């Protein structure tokens, strides 16, 4: 089972444009996050999923420098962007992370993935985000590629398509 962390990133944030590449202690915030994700033992590959807007060319350049896979797709249909990123990177299990959380804990990532792999609950989704059980910024969502493909095929909600996982929780 290929476990791929898909990091959702874009430069056109409405509240703080460019925040994912803003420097924190002389390093881009996304660089700090990638370092922490790389410490997670359960993650086999990391891919940054960004938009096909030209403003996100900076993220593609950053991914190249960081030696991280990149997928570019629709700005608004983030669900489809995740699906294509998973397909192109051979993901069986997807760990969804957002690029504006540089303090993500690798042990929490490993814990969520290990629960998912146990399948003792018969679930295709494991999360500490719904209901929130950890502080904001430590959110980890883990789901099967099959669940992602079903959500992408079945939902027509623009909200679901923009926010990736709401379909899972209904």
Language-model-detected regions and their locations in the chain:
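Conserved donor nucleotide-binding strand/loop of the catalytic core
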Residues: 64-76, 87
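Acidic helix N-cap motif at the loop->helix transition within catalytic regions
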Residues: 55-64
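Conserved donor-nucleotide/metal-binding helix-loop-beta segment in metal-dependent transferases, i.e.
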Residues: 84, 89, 105-133
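Glycine-rich, basic loop-to-helix element that forms the pyrophosphate-binding segment
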Residues: 59, 77-85
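N-terminal glycine-rich phosphate-binding loop and ensuing alpha1 helix
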Residues: 2-50
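Acidic metal-phosphate-binding loop of nucleotide-sugar-dependent transferases
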Residues: 76, 101-103
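Short aromatic/hydrophobic "clamp" motif used to bind/position activated sugar donors
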Residues: 94-95
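Active-site oxyanion/phosphate-handling segment shared across diverse enzymes
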Residues: 143-170
């Amino acid at each position: 089972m290929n476990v791929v962390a898909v990091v959702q990133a874009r430069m056109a944030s409405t509240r703080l444009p460019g925040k994912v590449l803003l420097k924190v202690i002389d390093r881009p915030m996304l660089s700090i996050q990638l370092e922490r994700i790389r410490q997670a033992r359960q993650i086999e590959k990391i891919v940054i999923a960004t938009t096909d807007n030209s403003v996100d060319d900076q993220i593609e350049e950053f991914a190249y420098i960081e030696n991280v896979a990149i997928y570019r797709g629709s700005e608004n249909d983030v669900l489809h962007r995740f699906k294509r990123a998973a397909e192109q990177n051979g993901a069986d299990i997807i760990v969804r992370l957002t690029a504006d959380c540089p303090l993500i804990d690798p042990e929490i990532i490993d814990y969520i993935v290990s629960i998912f792999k146990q399948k003792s609950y018969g679930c295709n989704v494991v999360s500490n985000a719904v209901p929130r059980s950890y502080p904001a910024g430590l959110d980890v969502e883990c789901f099967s590629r099959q669940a992602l493909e079903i959500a992408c095929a079945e939902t027509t909600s623009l909200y679901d398509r923009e926010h990736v996982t709401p379909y899972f929780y209904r």
